[in-house]
Amino acid sequence: MSERKNSKSRRNYLVKCSCPNCTQESEHSFSRVQKGALLICPHCNKVFQTNLKAVA
């Protein structure tokens, strides 16, 4: 039986997203951003969701 490659580990890198509240950039996991999960800004501690059309 052959082992499967762990393809998820290759996609788990950081991308920069700007907060809509304070406009500061912060790094978040690519998989989290791609799923449309809620993100927390480390600068102003506000919760936001990225617009995938703007990132792509």
UniProtKB/Swiss-Prot annotation:
Region forming the signal peptide: none
GO MF annotation list: metal ion binding
Upregulating conditions: Expressed equally in exponential and stationary phase in rich medium (at protein level).
Annotated S-S bridges: none
Binding site for Zn(2+): 19, 22, 41, 44
Keyword entries, A-Z: Metal-binding, Zinc
Free-text cofactor note: Might bind 1 zinc ion.
Family matches, as NCBIfam families: zinc_YnfU_fam (NF038384)
Miscellaneous comment text of the record: Encoded in the Qin prophage.
Protein name listed in UniProt: Putative zinc-binding protein YnfU
Organism whose genome encodes this protein: Escherichia coli (strain K12)
